[in-house]
């Protein structure tokens, strides 16, 4: 798997120890939430309306590519509502009892955040339906003919589900969310503001041009931007005086093999394979996976989304095609 050694992979277990730093620099209020203006403006209205009625916020589904701030937004919502948040994930909730234990410990208007909600088991999902709709918990007591169902009333609460695969949610679950928000890849000016804010939180000396250089190569993803910032900081402290300007950021990121478009060696390997081995395509996923020695799921979920979003790769019914922009980037004649 390539995730373990990709600095620009949005989800990389190798960087879990940096979650503590990420939590320290995450915004706590909607006013500090950079980018995603449509989401921020809508959530501000929904939250204020719920507060005016003294009600729990409607259940909220947040979806989009990894690293765009779904967990951050969930925590901001709880903070703005002035309530507690309990966090879990779909794979952790193996049994109905696991979910029941969380639900029965919620206080009025609290937030329950379930990351990777598309990975809930059908058994757990069935328990969630009446909890979301009627604030009730249906529990089976006993087994066989003696089994009986009892109902437990729950306080009003807000379920916030996060997923990178909204299409994998079942219709009954998806339809029970009153609010749905899609997070998009960030624009460079918004990422620059995020990098500058993170640098200030970390006490770094950073010029606006240095923040811009990091933002350009962060693939539209705040998580990657903050990770690159930390590595640029290391470079500046060892090779310079700790001050980060555009030149320092450029040298650091080139050393890390992250080019001007945010591509690393795996992105280049994939695009070059299509252009040089398959004449630019179309090429099927199986052939492409064999050509670069990577799993199909990794290509589809990790490598392709950004390349497609930026216009370097196309998915067609006949296979993948490298675009004119890809040829231009590598200086290869078509």
Swiss-Prot record:
Chain positions covered by the region annotation Head domain (RuvB-H): 260-334
Compartments where located: Cytoplasm
CDD domains: AAA (cd00009)
UniProt domain comment: Has 3 domains, the large (RuvB-L) and small ATPase (RuvB-S) domains and the C-terminal head (RuvB-H) domain. The head domain binds DNA, while the ATPase domains jointly bind ATP, ADP or are empty depending on the state of the subunit in the translocation cycle. During a single DNA translocation step the structure of each domain remains the same, but their relative positions change.
InterPro entries linked to this entry: AAA+_ATPase (IPR003593), AAA_lid_4 (IPR041445), DNA_helicase_Holl-junc_RuvB (IPR004605), P-loop_NTPase (IPR027417), RuvB-like_N (IPR008824), RuvB_C (IPR008823), WH-like_DNA-bd_sf (IPR036388), WH_DNA-bd_sf (IPR036390)
Its EC number(s): 3.6.4.-
Domain of life: Bacteria
Functional summary from the UniProt entry: The RuvA-RuvB-RuvC complex processes Holliday junction (HJ) DNA during genetic recombination and DNA repair, while the RuvA-RuvB complex plays an important role in the rescue of blocked DNA replication forks via replication fork reversal (RFR). RuvA specifically binds to HJ cruciform DNA, conferring on it an open structure. The RuvB hexamer acts as an ATP-dependent pump, pulling dsDNA into and through the RuvAB complex. RuvB forms 2 homohexamers on either side of HJ DNA bound by 1 or 2 RuvA tetramers; 4 subunits per hexamer contact DNA at a time.
Alphabetic keyword roster: ATP-binding, Cytoplasm, DNA damage, DNA recombination, DNA repair, DNA-binding, Hydrolase, Nucleotide-binding
Similarity comment: Belongs to the RuvB family.
SUPFAM superfamilies: P-loop containing nucleoside triphosphate hydrolases, Winged helix' DNA-binding domain
Biological process according to GO: DNA recombination; DNA repair
Gene3D superfamilies for the chain: 1.10.8.60, P-loop containing nucleotide triphosphate hydrolases, Winged helix-like DNA-binding domain superfamily/Winged helix DNA-binding domain
Signal peptide region: none
UniProt protein name: Holliday junction branch migration complex subunit RuvB
Enzyme class: hydrolase
Pfam families named among the record's database cross-references: AAA_lid_4, RuvB_C, RuvB_N
Binding of DNA, residues: 315, 320
Residues holding ATP: 25-26, 67, 70-72, 133-135, 176, 186, 223
Quaternary state and interactors: Homohexamer. Forms an RuvA(8)-RuvB(12)-Holliday junction (HJ) complex. HJ DNA is sandwiched between 2 RuvA tetramers; dsDNA enters through RuvA and exits via RuvB. An RuvB hexamer assembles on each DNA strand where it exits the tetramer. Each RuvB hexamer is contacted by two RuvA subunits (via domain III) on 2 adjacent RuvB subunits; this complex drives branch migration. In the full resolvosome a probable DNA-RuvA(4)-RuvB(12)-RuvC(2) complex forms which resolves the HJ.
Origin organism lineage: Bacteria, Pseudomonadati, Pseudomonadota, Gammaproteobacteria, Vibrionales
GO CC, one annotated term: cytoplasm
Region Small ATPAse domain (RuvB-S), annotated ranges: 187-257
Residues reported in the UniProt entry to bind Mg(2+): 71
GO molecular function annotation: ATP binding; ATP hydrolysis activity; four-way junction DNA binding; four-way junction helicase activity
Catalytic activities: ATP + H2O = ADP + phosphate + H(+)
Region of interest (Large ATPase domain (RuvB-L)), residue spans: 4-186
């Amino acid at each position: 798997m390539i995730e373990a050694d990709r600095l620009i992979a949005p989800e990389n277990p190798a960087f879990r120890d940096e979650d503590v730093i990420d939590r320290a620099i995450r915004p706590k209020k909607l006013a500090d939430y950079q980018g995603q203006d449509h989401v921020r403006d809508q959530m501000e209205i929904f939250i204020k309306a719920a507060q005016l009625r003294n009600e729990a916020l409607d259940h909220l589904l947040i979806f989009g590519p990894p690293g765009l701030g779904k967990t951050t937004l969930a925590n901001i919502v709880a903070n703005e509502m002035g309530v507690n948040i309990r966090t879990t994930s779909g794979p952790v909730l193996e049994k109905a009892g696991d979910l029941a234990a969380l639900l029965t410990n919620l206080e009025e208007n609290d937030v329950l955040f379930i990351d990777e909600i598309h990975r809930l088991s059908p058994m757990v999902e069935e328990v969630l339906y009446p909890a979301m709709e009627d604030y009730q918990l249906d529990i089976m007591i006993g087994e066989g003919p003696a089994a009986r169902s009892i109902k437990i009333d729950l306080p009003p609460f807000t379920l916030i589900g996060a997923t990178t695969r909204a299409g994998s949610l079942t219709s009954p679950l998806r339809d029970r969310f009153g609010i749905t928000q899609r997070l998009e890849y960030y624009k460079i000016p918004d990422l620059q503001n995020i990098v500058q804010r993170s640098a200030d939180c970390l006490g770094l000396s950073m010029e606006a041009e240095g923040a811009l250089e990091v933002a350009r190569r962060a693939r539209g993803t705040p998580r990657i931007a903050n990770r690159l910032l930390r590595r640029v900081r290391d470079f500046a402290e060892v090779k310079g005086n700790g001050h980060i300007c555009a030149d320092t950021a450029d040298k650091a990121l080139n050393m890390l093999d992250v080019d001007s478009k945010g591509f690393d060696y795996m992105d280049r390997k994939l695009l070059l394979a299509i252009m040089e081995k398959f004449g630019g395509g179309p090429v099927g996923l199986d052939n492409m996976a064999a050509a670069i020695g990577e799993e199909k799921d990794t290509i589809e979920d990790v490598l392709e989304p950004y390349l497609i979003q930026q216009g370097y790769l196309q998915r067609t019914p006949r296979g993948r095609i490298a675009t004119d922009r890809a040829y231009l980037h590598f200086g290869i004649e078509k």
